[in-house]
Amino acid sequence: VDTQEPQFDGEKVILPQATHEAQKAYAASGMLSAAQDYDIGGMQLPYTVEAAANSFFAMASVSIGSGMLTTGNANLLMVHGTDLQKQVFALNEFSGRFSGTMCLSEPQAGSSLSDVATRAVPDGEGFESDALGPRYRLKGNKMWISAGEHELTENIIHLVLAKIPGPDGKMVPGTRGISLFIVPKKLVDTDGQLTGERNDVALAGLNHKCGWRGTTNTLLNFGEGKYPVRGEAGAVGYLVGQPGKGLHCMFH
């Protein structure tokens, strides 16, 4: 797949057919949930064995490694998510129906996460009582996001670091103010079914790579208004864990 660079046609990312087939084969192998318990479809493999098994896939193509992002995303939710977040998001990632990303860096904030500028504000009255978690609207940009946009799975579940402004409307400085949010590409209901509404997450561009092109590397815009939700700009996100504890969750 390294000979066929991903293309963006303005609406969706086009990847080689081989990448689609590899993604399906990897999910069918059960490796996405290999280290999980039997009762959620796992094999209960030790992490060392899981890592060794993944080396065989890496030998075929490192590009299939994007599946490990999905596993990491779901593993985080199994520890820090609510029961419904686990059911709706994590289990669908383990099955391969959904895929996952981790959105930390921004154009102006690579490894310096204290400079994160993506904002998250409460989404109207009753935002705290949403069944999927306290509901916020996110606005900002995330850079160098692997597998951030594609058509390989039914949905993409972004885990996004953002700051909730204080009562004075200002961002809390440093990493203390960073929270973690689930931001699905396509909105879902409490049964994990797609509602038919696209979330306000848009691909701004693909980063060109020297190799490993089977996995896209992206710049994503959250909340720019390209896909308004209920007539408003702002990507809908659900809080994971406690406000201000985003790095603690993300570095699980």
Briefly describe each language-model feature range.
Residues T3-F8, L32-D39, N54-A60, L69-N75, ...:
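Glycine- and acidic
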Residues V1-G67, L84, V88:
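Amphipathic, small/basic residue-rich leader segments at the start of a protein or domain
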